[in-house]
Amino acid sequence: IFSYGIILLLHLIKQSAENRTTRSWNLSIRNSVKQIQRSNSREKAKGTYMSETELAATLEDAYDLALEKAAIEAFEGQYEAEELSKLVQQEEIIKKAMNLIWER
């Protein structure tokens, strides 16, 4: 879940910072969301392994790595992670990720 969280956040950060999207980013977002949902789903017991709070904490933990990767990719690598962080709202990105994962 952590690894897919990094990929999901990476593309949401790029979308927010660059104020645009690509088909490739959209596909990566959909794939990451699906993989997180599958990994977190309990088949036999029905329900999830991680609560909403635990999942949010995992995404918050993954955010810094996603931001570092996004700094390399967004704007062709012109910004350092610190500079890029000023262009986006961490809370909003994590909220969007949670809404996608929980299908809200």
Annotated model-derived regions:
Residues 1-104:
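Surface/interface-facing alpha-helical segments and adjacent flexible terminal/loop regions used
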